[in-house]
């Protein structure tokens, strides 16, 4: 049993066979964003190491994935700048939100669930994260004019965009958060 932790002296670390220090130090605030990001990065690196060791990834694939991780890390400062500007533009709407709902699909379901956790911890209003299809099978019925919806996508997705367009008249605001560069007034395009 191995533990990924920011505290190699923690009770879980002491009870494990092996410890991987994620090297973030102990975060002094109640919401641990740095730890989440470092944990995801370490899990990706572990998966790559295991795949390489088991012959499921060749040296070229390993180099490709490592280059992609470096590219993403290099894009973080620009993503922070774009996000800050987006929040500034929509600060009144975001401040007035009484409930936040994040929608993701595929690997982005985890991001939607983490959004649920972080918004609940920091904004301290009810927040939920849903898988796109699951949201369409009932939870959408609770939407009202005080809700803010966040549609998270890595690539443009017809179903996500159709649901966003369908929900927009029923909620305070529907935003799209995308890795692409197609920004409009209600889309945060991280371009990475």
Regions found by a protein language model. Name each.
Residues 1-192:
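A SIS-like phosphosugar-recognition module
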């Amino acid at each position: 049993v191995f533990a990924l932790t920011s505290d190699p002296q923690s009770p879980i670390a002491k009870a494990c066979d092996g410890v991987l220090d994620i090297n973030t130090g102990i975060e002094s605030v109640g919401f641990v964003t740095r730890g989440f990001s470092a944990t995801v990065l370490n899990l990706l690196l572990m998966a790559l190491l295991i795949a390489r060791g088991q012959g499921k990834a060749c040296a070229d694939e390993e180099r490709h994935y490592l280059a992609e991780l470096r590219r993403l890390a290099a894009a973080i400062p620009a993503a922070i700048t774009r996000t800050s500007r987006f929040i500034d533009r929509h600060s009144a709407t975001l401040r007035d939100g009484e409930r936040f709902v994040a929608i993701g699909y595929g690997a982005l379901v985890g991001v939607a669930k983490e959004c649920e956790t972080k918004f609940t911890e920091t904004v301290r209003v009810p927040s939920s994260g849903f898988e796109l299809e699951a949201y369409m099978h009932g939870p959408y019925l609770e939407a009202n004019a005080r809700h803010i919806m966040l549609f998270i996508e890595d690539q443009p997705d017809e179903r996500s965009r159709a649901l966003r367009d369908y929900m927009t008249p029923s909620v305070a605001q529907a935003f799209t958060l995308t890795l692409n560069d197609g920004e409009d007034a209600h889309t945060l395009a991280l371009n990475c």
